[in-house]
Design a protein with these regions (language model features):
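C-terminal ends of transmembrane helices
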Residues: 70, 136-149, 201, 264-272
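Small-residue-rich segments of transmembrane alpha-helices in multi-pass membrane proteins
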Residues: 23-29, 154-171, 215-220, 279-295
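Hydrophobic core of alpha-helical transmembrane segments in multi-pass integral membrane proteins
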Residues: 26-31, 98-107, 131-138, 231-240, ...
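Functional transmembrane core segments of multi-pass inner-membrane proteins
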Residues: 33-45, 129, 157-207, 221-238
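Intramembrane alpha-helical segments
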Residues: 3-12, 81-178
């Protein structure tokens, strides 16, 4: 196979499933904030910012594989870089191109906002969120940075904040950066994803020798306890927006499938079924976001 890589190899490197989730998150944030699908120029802005997120996340994921090359030779030898499907030099070039494309989309989004007669300050929160995400990326694993990836739980939280901010980014794009429903999505994303990141670190313990993940520092059992506590915080984040009438209280019934899935996580963790626990967390979060979306559209 060519060292420049085939299409499927690049999609694997970019973790296209995760990046598309980011795209959905932007639209979800916009829809939840507006209570309807964005139309006209708001739809253009949302699309541009969704493409920006796609390129940003693809760049982040590729960069993560570049820095994790030696670890992936043990944990994931089938990944594009350790398998040789894509050369490191090609990955670095495309990573840079994707990040530049993300920035260009942001500029185009601002030009669209400006054409609507709005001030820069109306859209500025979108740029602030993009810069925060860039800061987290730069300090996650770059040399001579905070190296959050090697700090255990803080690294998991950094990743999860970037995930949660996607929904707020979508709301900010339609000029509603302080929308309470969008920030409810943020909290759900942070707690669910942090719990899942901890569980994934438990799964990767064999290949993480020498890394300072939470699981490596405190052991698998203590890490599972932490993951469960974070899951309970996720449960609170699911229920509280209905209790405080951010969403109509009666619509809490929409969250029942998400809550049931979340409650099943505990037994998986107790039985050391870490992969199953991770899958349940992902399923529960998806069901929760679907519930929030349904509540917003129904009103």
């Amino acid at each position: 196979m060519s060292r420049t890589g085939s299409g499927p190899a690049w999609l694997t490197l970019f973790r296209i499933g995760n990046t598309l989730t980011g795209v959905i998150g932007v639209f979800l944030g916009a829809i939840v904030a507006l209570g309807e699908l964005p139309t006209g120029k708001l739809a253009v802005i949302t699309t541009l910012q969704a493409i920006s997120v796609l390129c940003f996340m693809a760049s982040w994921n590729a960069l993560n594989d570049i820095f994790d090359l030696e670890i992936d030779r043990i944990n994931r030898p089938d990944r594009p870089l350790p398998s040789g499907s894509i050369s490191v030099s090609s990955a670095k070039i495309v990573t840079s191109v994707m990040m530049v494309t993300s920035l260009i989309c942001m500029l185009l989004a601002w030009f669209t906002v400006d054409s609507m007669g709005h001030e820069f300050s109306d859209w500025a929160p979108s740029l602030v969120i993009w810069i925060i995400a860039l800061f987290l990326l730069a300090n996650y694993e770059f040399p001579n940075s905070l190296r959050l990836k090697d700090r255990g739980l803080p690294g998991n939280i950094a990743i999860s904040i970037s995930v949660g901010l996607v929904a707020v980014f979508g709301a900010a794009g339609v000029l509603q950066p302080y929308n309470h429903r969008a920030w409810s999505l943020f909290l759900v994303g942070v707690f669910y994803n942090t719990s899942r990141e901890v569980v994934k670190d438990i799964e990767d313990m064999e290949g993480d020798e020498g890394r300072n993940t939470l699981a490596m520092r405190v052991g698998a059992d203590s890490a599972r306890t932490t993951a469960w506590v974070l899951s309970l915080l996720a449960l609170a984040a699911v229920i509280m927006p209905f209790a405080f009438e951010v969403f109509p209280p009666l619509h809490v019934v929409f969250t029942i499938p998400a809550v049931i899935s979340l409650m099943l996580v505990k037994s998986k963790l107790l039985n050391s079924e870490d992969h199953e626990a991770s899958s349940l967390l992902k399923k529960s979060m998806t069901l929760c976001l679907a519930a929030f979306l349904a509540s917003s559209l129904i009103g």
